């Protein structure tokens, strides 16, 4: 499906043909990607799906340091990963990037993705001849099709699952969402610096447990870890980057609600970011689960 950006007026006067080369990309929309991923899971086809969202794409252009402090090591690792994936089979290693126009994201636009900064980064660092996918396609807080989210959860619950995620995630929440899971814990603060030890631990656990699916919610450690595991495990297990979708359920577990500009600690250890209120998203999903 070919997507083009119009005259730029919808982007605050920015010209997509100059700043965002996405008008010429071959893209798969959220619905298309979801169909591919769900079918892969149903048919036990091994694949990986990683999301290069506003975090890493903004970070490499020094525009986004709220999740990690500025560090050339992180920036260079991301750029190296971007180049590596160009050589991977595009059906085996699917790459999701921000594409939050209504046609790509089921009629809804993400309130958080910094799409302009992301596309400037893409133009510099990603192979624009590669096939890309709308990055909200798995189950997303932003594209709040909660029934689709439950469909994804049900598919995953039928598998043997490992979650590589925040050390603060309560196992009760993980088991509620994804079934009886194994949790490889990731540091809450500056997770990137632990990506090599995380990779080694996942390999160890995979050899011992032979998981069907490994889910990643590991902040900046997700990207280098998934790339490394794809190579070291020789594409032998399905890996899916689920972003921060677990977070609203953790907030609900601890009875945390929206705190705009609140005194919260981010993954960089800094204070002052905010937690968005996804109360309705969580409530709707919990109701569907309870009614099943």
Model-flagged regions — what are they?
Residues 114-115, 161-212:
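Conserved nucleotide-cofactor-binding alpha/beta core module
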Residues 221-292:
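C-terminal functional extensions of proteins
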Residues 213-217:
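Short catalytic-loop micro-motif centered on adjacent basic/acidic residues
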Residues 55, 101, 219-221, 245:
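Short glycine-rich anion-binding loops that position phosphate/pyrophosphate groups of nucleotides
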Residues 32-35, 77-84, 196-206, 222-223:
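A short, acidic, amphipathic alpha-helical segment used as a generic capping/interface helix at domain edges
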Residues 102, 188-190, 246:
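Residue-level detector of flexible, active-site-proximal loop/helix-junction positions
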Residues 1-177:
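Electropositive, gly/pro-rich neighborhoods at or near active sites that engage anionic ligands
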Residues 99, 185-187, 243:
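Residues at the C-termini of beta-strands that transition into short coil/loop
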């Amino acid at each position: 499906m070919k997507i083009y950006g119009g005259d730029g007026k919808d982007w605050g006067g920015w010209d997509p043909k100059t700043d965002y080369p996405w008008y010429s990309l071959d893209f798969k929309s959220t619905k298309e990607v979801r169909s591919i991923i769900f079918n892969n899971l149903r048919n036990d086809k091994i694949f990986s799906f990683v999301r290069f969202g506003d975090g890493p794409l903004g970070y490499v252009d020094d525009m986004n340091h709220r999740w990690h402090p500025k560090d050339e090591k992180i920036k260079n690792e991301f750029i190296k990963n971007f180049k590596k994936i160009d050589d991977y089979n595009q059906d085996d290693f699917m790459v999701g990037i921000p594409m939050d126009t209504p046609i790509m994201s089921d009629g809804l636009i993400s309130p958080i993705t910094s799409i302009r900064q992301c596309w400037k980064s893409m133009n510099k660092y990603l192979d624009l001849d590669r096939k890309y996918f709308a990055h909200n396609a798995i189950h997303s807080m932003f594209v709040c099709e909660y029934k689709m989210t439950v469909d994804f959860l049900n598919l995953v619950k039928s598998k043997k699952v490992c979650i590589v995620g925040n050390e603060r995630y309560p196992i009760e929440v993980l088991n509620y969402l994804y079934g009886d899971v194994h949790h490889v814990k990731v540091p809450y603060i500056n997770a990137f610096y632990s990506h090599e030890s995380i990779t080694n631990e996942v390999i160890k656990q995979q050899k011992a447990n032979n998981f069907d699916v490994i889910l990643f919610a590991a902040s900046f450690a997700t990207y280098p870890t998934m790339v490394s595991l794809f190579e070291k495990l020789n594409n032998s297990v399905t890996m899916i980057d689920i972003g921060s979708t677990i977070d609203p359920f953790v907030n609900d577990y601890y009875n945390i609600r929206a705190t705009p500009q609140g005194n919260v600690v981010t993954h960089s250890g800094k204070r002052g970011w905010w937690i968005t209120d996804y109360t309705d998203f969580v409530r709707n999903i919990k109701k569907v689960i309870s009614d099943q």
